[in-house]
């Protein structure tokens, strides 16, 4: 009897129907099913970014974090004064929104700075300042991508909009749906084709990369907000504003502009 019980508990029979001879259990039939626990985010063991002993937002001066912020997810510094993460479903949605916005902000910040950097080093663009570049599509000659007429030559804002919707919608749909075979478990970190360098192969390194992504992404979102404010206030790109500040920091800073700014002038 004991040996039969031990044999039935073996993982080799997980998920299979096991017929036991009637000589052992009468006319009994035992069905065993494998149940998988819900996967939890992997955290790097001994990492300072995860768990109850993780780094908090004010270091040793931080108060007790809310009970629902356990350090299970990357970027959790125990700070949620507004209680935005108290509801698990809202927390999951906000986590996804933050990661996606972080990635867009990092790409956006690079796209704002890099063309202006190239233009300041002799590369010819029709317009290198990020918030002015798009308006070139309304010019007589249209907009040449990278200033090269042999690349994409855009003359219709509606066509550009349609292409963006189709292309980005396809990529996002692919990510959210889990790929063509639905093999992606976590749409935030799909891996596979989205990780050609295999950066997620090591769980501990992957856990640290998640934290780095969020930290840099949060800075990028603040940077993009600053770029928008600069564009409204000074009408210049981020690198030109930086050059002006270095040349005359007393008269070219946020405080000076705030005290002298008159909207519409």
Swiss-Prot record:
List of residues binding chlorophyll a 1: 79, 85, 98, 218
Residues that hold chlorophyll b 2 according to the record: 103, 152, 181
Binding residue positions for chlorophyll b 1: 57
Positions with a binding annotation for chlorophyll b 4: 164, 175
Membrane topology annotation: Multi-pass membrane protein
Binding-site residues, chlorophyll a 2: 101
Residues given in the record as chlorophyll a 5 binding sites: 212, 230
Any GO BP annotation: photosynthesis, light harvesting in photosystem I
A Pfam family the protein falls into: Chloroa_b-bind
Binding-site residues, chlorophyll a 3: 136, 146, 213
Co-factor remark: Binds at least 14 chlorophylls (8 Chl-a and 6 Chl-b) and carotenoids such as lutein and neoxanthin.
Residues with N2-acetylarginine modification: 33
Transit peptide start and end: 1-32
Post-translational modification: Photoregulated by reversible phosphorylation of its threonine residues.
Binding site for chlorophyll b 5: 164, 261
Localization in the cell: Plastid, Chloroplast thylakoid membrane
GO MF annotations, alphabetized: chlorophyll binding; metal ion binding
SUPFAM superfamilies assigned: Chlorophyll a-b binding protein
Binding residues for chlorophyll a 6: 245, 254
Phosphothreonine modified-residue sites: 35
Swiss-Prot/TrEMBL keywords: Acetylation, Chlorophyll, Chloroplast, Chromophore, Magnesium, Membrane, Metal-binding, Phosphoprotein, Photosynthesis, Photosystem I, Photosystem II, Plastid, Thylakoid, Transit peptide, Transmembrane, Transmembrane helix
Comment text on domains: The N-terminus of the protein extends into the stroma where it is involved with adhesion of granal membranes and post-translational modifications; both are believed to mediate the distribution of excitation energy between photosystems I and II.
Assembly and binders: The LHC complex consists of chlorophyll a-b binding proteins.
Primary role: The light-harvesting complex (LHC) functions as a light receptor, it captures and delivers excitation energy to photosystems with which it is closely associated.
Family named by the database record: Belongs to the light-harvesting chlorophyll a/b-binding (LHC) protein family.
Name this protein carries in UniProt: Chlorophyll a-b binding protein, chloroplastic
Organism this protein belongs to: Zea mays (Maize)
């Amino acid at each position: 009897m004991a040996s039969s019980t031990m044999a039935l508990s073996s993982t080799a029979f997980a998920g299979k129907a096991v017929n036991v001879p009637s000589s052992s259990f009468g006319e009994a039939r035992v069905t065993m099913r494998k149940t998988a626990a819900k996967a939890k985010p992997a955290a790097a063991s001994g990492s300072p970014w995860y768990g109850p002993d993780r780094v908090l937002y004010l270091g040793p001066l931080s108060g007790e974090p809310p009970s629902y912020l356990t350090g299970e997810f990357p970027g959790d510094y125990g700070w949620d004064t507004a209680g935005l993460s108290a509801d698990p479903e809202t927390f999951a949605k906000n986590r996804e929104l933050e990661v996606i916005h972080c990635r867009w902000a990092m790409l956006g910040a690079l796209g704002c700075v890099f063309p202006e950097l190239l233009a300041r080093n002799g590369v010819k663009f029709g317009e290198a300042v990020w918030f002015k570049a798009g308006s070139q599509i309304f010019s007589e000659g249209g907009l040449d991508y990278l200033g090269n007429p042999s690349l994409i030559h855009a003359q219709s804002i509606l066509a550009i909009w349609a292409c963006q919707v189709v292309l980005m919608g396809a990529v996002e749909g692919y990510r959210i749906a889990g790929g063509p075979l639905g093999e992606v478990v976590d749409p935030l970190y799909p891996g596979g084709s989205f990780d050609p360098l295999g950066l997620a192969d090591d769980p501990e390194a992957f856990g640290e990369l998640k934290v780095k992504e969020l930290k840099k992404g949060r800075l990028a979102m603040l940077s993009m907000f600053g770029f928008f404010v600069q564009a409204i206030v000074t009408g210049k790109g981020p690198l030109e504003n930086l050059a002006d500040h270095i040349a005359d920091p007393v008269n070219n800073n946020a405080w000076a502009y705030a005290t002298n700014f008159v909207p519409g002038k």
